[in-house]
């Protein structure tokens, strides 16, 4: 199976995502500089939220690669977990804009993937649509740059992977390729590089 030939490489990427659990602390301090007990508690909620996302990132990547499925029993609870942890952090710091961005990110990502599924049912699975909403919560919480870059990066990674398979004659245009791992890799790209890339792009536009 063409996808299996590249599974080892993709699984290494997914395993590397688990290292984001350790990096979640640094991410939290980048979002919230703790100075009060409430801010320390908020930082702990952010760390927990992104550590949880790191764990399910690996689990979902492995499952999708092997079965072409993103199980509801893992994806759907992530809405509640991510929502509760990140909302708690935002409430403690009174960062209402983060709450708005997370909500907009969830709706926008879900709606975008839902439309893609309607337009081309065979190209996007229902699990991808549900996962998109979860990813939107995390990326939106961080910022608009993270949301834009994370959403776009998934299609870049998936497209490059698909082209590479076709050029190596391991796949055809009709070959089913799991998209979940690329959504997840794109999400983590948005998490750690989205704001910087977004700022760089705005500076570039301003200089044109």
Feature-to-residue mapping (PLM):
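Transmembrane helix exit motif
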Residues: 193-196
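Interfacial loop-to-transmembrane junctions
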Residues: 166-189, 201
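Functional transmembrane core segments of multi-pass inner-membrane proteins
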Residues: 60-63, 67-159, 199-208
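Transmembrane alpha-helical segments of integral membrane proteins
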Residues: 156-168
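Intramembrane alpha-helical segments
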Residues: 12, 22-92
């Amino acid at each position: 199976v063409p996808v299996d030939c590249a599974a080892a490489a993709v699984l290494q990427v997914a395993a590397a995502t688990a290292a984001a659990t350790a990096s979640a602390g640094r991410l939290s301090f980048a979002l919230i500089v703790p100075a009060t007990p409430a801010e320390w508690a908020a930082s702990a909620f952010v760390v927990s939220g992104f550590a949880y996302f790191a764990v399910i990132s690996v689990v979902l990547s492995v499952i999708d690669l092997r079965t072409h499925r993103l199980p509801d029993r893992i994806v759907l609870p992530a809405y509640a977990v991510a929502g509760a942890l990140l909302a708690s952090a935002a409430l403690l710091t009174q960062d209402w804009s983060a709450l708005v961005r997370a909500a907009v990110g969830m709706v926008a990502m879900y709606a975008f993937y839902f439309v893609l599924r309607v337009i081309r049912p065979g190209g996007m699975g229902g699990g991808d649509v549900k996962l998109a909403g979860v990813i939107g919560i995390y990326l939106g919480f961080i910022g608009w740059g993270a949301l834009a870059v994370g959403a776009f990066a998934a299609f870049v990674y998936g497209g490059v992977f698909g082209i590479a398979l076709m050029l190596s004659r391991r796949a055809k245009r009709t070959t089913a390729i799991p998209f979940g791992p690329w959504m997840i890799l794109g999400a983590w790209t948005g998490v750690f590089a989205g704001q910087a890339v977004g700022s760089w792009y705005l500076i570039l536009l301003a200089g044109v």
